């Protein structure tokens, strides 16, 4: 029996497949969009599908790494169509799954989590625009995630928060 699961799949760019965040509509391709959704939305959805059967019925927490750019209401910059859309779809999947998890498990909480900019291969091409104090180590990121999960109101089915514990709008 598992009481906490953290789903960390995701990608923003893939040099081998020549996939990069789109800056304009003309940059869109069906192949890139399909890859974004396969990795950022479908894979976590399949994890949610299988985890519901093995999670602790009295204390289940599932967090999916999402991104603030997956917030529909917070999108003021545009661009990054595939990544944004796939993360927005992930957030809807988490929100929808939280309803079923609550029905099937006595105490379940699902979370879409924006970790900030983490010093990994995902963010490498974009780090030059990030202030040093806003570029987090994987260790710090993991500790913040666990800390924020422990502080959440378990009576609320689903949360979308960032590394500071602030609510991110859907």
What are these regions, as identified by a protein language model?
Residues 6, 63, 110-113, 123:
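Hydrophobic structural elements of the Rossmann-like NAD(P)H-binding subdomain
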Residues 58, 76, 152-156:
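Glycine/proline-rich active-site loop of Rossmann-fold NAD(P)-dependent oxidoreductases
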Residues 86, 117-120:
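Ser/Thr-centric signal marking residues that sit
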Residues 1-9, 13-14:
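A glycine-rich helix->loop->beta "capping" turn
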Residues 46-54, 97, 107-108, 151:
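A structural motif corresponding to the C-terminal end of an alpha-helix
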Residues 112, 120, 124-170:
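C-terminal helical subdomain
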Residues 91, 101-118, 156-160:
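Conserved Rossmann-fold SDR core element
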Residues 11-42, 46, 59-104:
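Catalytic loop of short-chain dehydrogenase/reductase
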